[in-house]
Amino acid sequence: MPKKGNYMQNEKFDKDTQLLVDVVTDYAFALDTLDDYDHQRLVLRKSTAAEKFHATYENAMAAIQGLKEKFGGSELFANEKDDSFKSSIGQIYQTVGGVELYPSVEQKAAMLLYLVTKNHSFSDGNKRIAATLFLWFLLNNGILYKDDGSKRVADATLVTMTLMIAESRPEDMEMMVKVVVNLMGRL
């Protein structure tokens, strides 16, 4: 016959175990995404094919100018260092044999976030500009907000994705884009 103390410990263990199982279940997508990332098997899911808005160098620079006017910044904020920003905008529409390399809105947005963050096209504000253009692109394509009006990408998620890209190795570009697209598909 089990001792009363052991029964109480087992009951607590069972409650703690169930609580942990519930938490893990609630975070299953995040844990599965991390596992897929670790094993280099992330795939692109749930994306929006229909693009309503086409980003150009000119309309992107107008958006950046609006950011600068509204939020200010240093004298160097948003000053282009070279032509790499123009290249970044063009690259999200790159094709091979007439087939887009980034066919979905989410892939283009993720690539835009990646390229503007990594290319350091501006003297100051690259991460802020990249995050703003990411949101701008999603907004203009009608997918920044959920049907109920809530944010599709939480503030903390945007910061995390941008910093993750900034700290990533160039050879991890494809995986970073997949992570961003997967997070957007789930949010």
Protein language model features and the residues they cover:
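FIC/Doc superfamily catalytic core
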Residues: 1-187
